[in-house]
Amino acid sequence: MQSPPDPANSSMHSQDPHPPRRQGRMNSKDITPVLKGWDYEPGTINVRKITGTDGRPKLQMRLDLGLLQMEMSGRPDGTTPHGCESLLDYYEARLDEHRRINGTDLGFHLTPEQCQSLREEAVMYYHRYISLFVLEEYSGVVRDTARNLRLLDLCSQFAEEEHDRLVLEQYRPYLIMMNVRARASIAYKNKQYAKALEAIQEG
């Protein structure tokens, strides 16, 4: 991770002899109008659903210095790494191919760099599933928590370094809890009370 700039190495001029000219289109990138009327509330998960310029629904999470915007499905940042829905899908496909060719998992490994990229991707899905939980869109919570649990399984089994095999395990109980709460909430909303209780007991 790149270190933040040192303020001591910065310079500020009280009078710039050649001040930059303002350009109209620069103002269009200012997110102040987007944040107006939507104050950040410390200790609260502030989220909302909006319609993007592409006509599709998107999630926004308010932060102290701005916001996060996420796609409702697929990878939250809207990218398709290596042509796949996510990095997890890409490495799972590589594992399947390795098994097909070799008939075994032996020899398949994830490097520290690959594990780091997977962890960064997992954070994106974390932001989305807690946003969806606040909005009571529980099916998306089930989907994303189950997906991150698959990621934990992949890293714990195939990471080259012990650190990468263990570092995410601290989050497994929380992921399971959120998955159970979401499944139980779906059943409860559908008045399937026995199924809601069953989901809790299974968790």
Question: For the regions a protein language model found, what residue spans apply to each?
Answer:
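Cationic, low-complexity basic patches in intrinsically disordered or flexible, solvent-exposed regions
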Residues: 3
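Acidic, Ala/Val/Gly-enriched low-complexity intrinsically disordered segments
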Residues: 6-8, 16
